[in-house]
């Protein structure tokens, strides 16, 4: 039973996917999803909020770059994460139209293009979040730490790492360019549905297990790296607080430094990511145990995009320099002339 769940876990990377054993049951539910206006409206509202928030965060990083302000080591990954989440949500919105809206459908090229890009952006979002956590741990590390030597690395090193990971993830998901097709016949049981128009060619149990194992190794490695870097940052913050109280007295509460505020925002982001990953795994397992219950299916549709929707708000709310920068832009353009 555990082996079946692991092999089926591969398809949780693709939205609206139904594992083969419950194909007929889930297919009928998918066809009728467009008639449920509550699920459709809630889903697109969630996607719309995420697109708006990530667009705002991306614009801030672009303005900061064009104005020549001093950038931090984490600025590039934060801007990249907002861009990746923005593109992923746009792909999810396009894919959702083929599930929630009844229409003529797509051809092979559109199916391959949308599902492949969505899969790639989801992987890059995970990778960039991990990179962001590690970089913040490097920034916070003391001079005596072995991580301190990475603090002054040129920005192009980060760009090369991101580019290499992008190529790697594009290669990992390249099998979708072959296996994803336009559904030739809605009544056949030979294809596994992704949406109403798109299906994935059936794979052997061995191939499913192989891809599932590779994806599981990737996810476990990156999430473990995030957890370790998060634990390291928490330990450093606790030690810093104890030292500050010892030197200045417990009656004083010194203002948090920009590095500490940035670290707290990263900690919030990583905690959210880990919680959403665990919750998504639980819901995915419940779908397998309870024959793809439509309630669990609907919950997974929303939960899979919560991180991409909420993450920009974490930076916007906790990063004081974002508010100050936007305020300075408005003052420069005389948009705050309130008498």
Curated annotation (Swiss-Prot):
Cellular localization per UniProt? Cell membrane
Q: List the disulfide bonds.
A: 111-198
The UniProt entry, under InterPro entries, shows: GPCR_Rhodpsn_7TM (IPR017452), Vmron_rcpt_1 (IPR004072)
In this protein, the residues bearing a glycan are 185
Which residue stretches are annotated as topological domain Extracellular? 1-42, 97-119, 182-213, 286-296
Topological domain (Cytoplasmic) residues are 64-75, 141-160, 235-264, 318-339
The transmembrane residues are 43-63, 76-96, 120-140, 161-181, 214-234, 265-285, 297-317
Among the record's GO biological process terms, what is one? sensory perception of chemical stimulus
Superkingdom of source: Eukaryota
Q: Which Pfam families match?
A: V1R
Function field:
Putative pheromone receptor implicated in the regulation of social as well as reproductive behavior.
Q: Which family does it belong to?
A: Belongs to the G-protein coupled receptor 1 family.
Protein name, per record:
Vomeronasal type-1 receptor A14
Q: Which gene encodes it?
A: V1ra14
């Amino acid at each position: 039973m555990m082996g079946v769940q692991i092999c089926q876990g591969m398809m949780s990377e693709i939205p609206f996917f139904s594992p083969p054993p419950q194909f007929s049951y889930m297919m009928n539910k998918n066809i009728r999803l467009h008639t449920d206006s509550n699920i459709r409206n809630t889903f697109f509202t969630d996607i719309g909020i995420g697109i708006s928030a990530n667009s705002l965060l991306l614009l801030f990083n672009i303005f900061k770059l064009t104005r020549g302000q001093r950038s931090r080591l984490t600025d590039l990954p934060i801007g990249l994460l907002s861009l990746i989440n923005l593109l992923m949500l746009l792909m999810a919105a396009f894919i959702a139209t083929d599930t929630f809206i009844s229409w003529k459908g797509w051809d092979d090229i559109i199916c391959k293009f949308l599902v492949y890009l969505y899969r790639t952006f989801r992987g890059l979002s995970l990778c960039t979040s991990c990179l962001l956590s590690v970089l913040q741990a490097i920034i916070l590390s003391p001079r005596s730490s072995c991580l301190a030597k990475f603090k002054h690395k040129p920005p192009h090193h980060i760009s090369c790492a991101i580019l290499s990971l992008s190529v790697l993830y594009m290669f990992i998901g390249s099998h979708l360019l072959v296996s994803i097709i336009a559904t030739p016949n809605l009544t056949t049981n030979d294809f596994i549905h992704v949406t109403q128009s798109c299906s994935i060619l059936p794979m052997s149990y061995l191939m499913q297990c192989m891809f599932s194992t590779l994806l599981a190794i990737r996810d476990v490695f990156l999430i473990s790296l995030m957890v370790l870097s998060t634990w390291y940052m928490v330990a450093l913050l606790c030690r810093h607080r104890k030292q500050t109280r010892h030197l200045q007295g417990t009656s004083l509460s010194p203002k948090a430094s920009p590095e500490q505020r940035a670290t707290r925002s990263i900690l919030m982001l990583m905690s959210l990511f880990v919680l959403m990953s665990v919750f998504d795994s639980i819901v995915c397992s419940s779908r397998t145990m309870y024959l793809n219950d439509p309630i669990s299916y609907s919950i997974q549709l929303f939960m899979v995009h919560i991180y991409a929707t909420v993450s920009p708000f974490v930076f916007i709310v906790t990063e004081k320099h974002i508010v100050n920068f936007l305020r300075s832009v408005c003052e420069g353009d005389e948009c705050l002339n309130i008498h």
